[in-house]
Regions:
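C-terminal accessory helical subdomains adjacent to catalytic cores in phosphodiester-
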Residues: 1-6, 17, 21-37, 51-65, ...
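Structural motif
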Residues: 42-50
Length: 161
C-alpha cells in the first residue's frame, strides 16, 4: 500500500473553510485536503483525534494546519500548544482578502479590516462572511500573487499579518 498525503486544515469559522474549498477547486492538487470548522473548541486532543481519524494506514501522512484569526488571545495560547502548522491572520482572515485589493501596513481592528475591504473595490461592497460571489472568487484568483507579495512584507504575528 502506498502512502497517501492528506492535509487537514482546521478552521476557526466558515469563511476560512470556504476559502480552503476554493483553493481545492482551483489547484486540484494530488493530495487530499480536508477542512473542518472547530471554532473555540480547538485543542491538542482535538487536532490529534481528527488527524488519527483521517489515517487509513500507518503509511498515511496527515499534516495538520490551524487557520485562525489572532484577535482572541485565549485562542492563540491554545493554538500554540497544538501539534500543527499555524496559518494565522492578525487581526482576522479578512486581512488576507484585503491584501488582494490593497496594501495594509498599519495596525487595524477586525471591524476596520472589514470596512476597508468593502471600500477597497466594488466587488467587495456587499461582502458577507462565509460566502464568496463568483466575482469575488475571480478577483481572489487573479490577485493572489499580489496578495502574497504584500503579505510577505508584513511582520509575522504583528498586526497586520
Amino acid at each position: 500500500m502506498r502512502m497517501r498525503k492528506i492535509i487537514l486544515v482546521i478552521c476557526e469559522g466558515e469563511t476560512e473553510e470556504s476559502y480552503v474549498n476554493l483553493l481545492k477547486r482551483w489547484y486540484k492538487l494530488p493530495i487530499r485536503i480536508v477542512s473542518r470548522v472547530a471554532g473555540t473548541r480547538v485543542s491538542p486532543s482535538f487536532v490529534e483525534k481528527w488527524t488519527n481519524e483521517l489515517k487509513i494506514s500507518r503509511e498515511d501522512d496527515v499534516q495538520a494546519y490551524l487557520m485562525y484569526d489572532m484577535d482572541v488571545e485565549a485562542i492563540n495560547e491554545k493554538l500554540r500548544s497544538c501539534k500543527a502548522g499555524l496559518l494565522l491572520s492578525n487581526p482576522c482572515f479578512e486581512l488576507w482578502l484585503l491584501l488582494h485589493a490593497k496594501d495594509q501596513r498599519s495596525a487595524v481592528s477586525s471591524d476596520e479590516v472589514i470596512k476597508a475591504l468593502r471600500d477597497s473595490n466594488p466587488v467587495w461592497q456587499r461582502y458577507a462572511k462565509s460566502v464568496f460571489t463568483d466575482k469575488q472568487k475571480d478577483f481572489l484568483k487573479e490577485y493572489t500573487p499580489i496578495a502574497i507579495d504584500r503579505a510577505m512584507h508584513l511582520a509575522e504575528f504583528d498586526n497586520p499579518s
